[in-house]
Amino acid sequence: MKAAVIQEIGTPLAIEDIPDPEPGLSDLILKVGACGICGTDLHMSENKDPNVGWRMMHPGCVMGHEFAGEVMEVGREAKQHWNPGDRVTALPWIGCGECPACQAGLGYRCPNVISRATPDLPGAYAEYCRVGARETIRLPGQVSFREGALVEPLAVGFNAVR
């Protein structure tokens, strides 16, 4: 599949062929319908100081954590709740599902969380991406993929003032 990949921090992204994602037992594979460009993506892709910001940006990294798309594949343990063709958005991580934080619905506090834009979980600046079924939100029919890609940044703003 095609993806926009970091070649070197501070240089433009390059379109490359990378392997298609494969679903884990409780994962979904999405065909990306829309993906936003977050200010964090811009800052991280330009940051050459290893002591500032996330250290996950590296050559070969695929960013993109504000996205929506269509479910194409469903992992065996997710088939009860998800089907190919479902229109969704997802959180920018996959939690383990087992720890107290995940059990309480606080996957972002999971000690084993896998964050998007890392080697283990490439982002959505690609044709397809892998998401955790627990971290996925179904989009109503009247919500476009472009609007669905705004769910994550809208949630950040909402929770900031809540």
Predicted regions span which residues?
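Extreme N-terminal starter segment of soluble prokaryotic enzymes
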Residues: 1-2
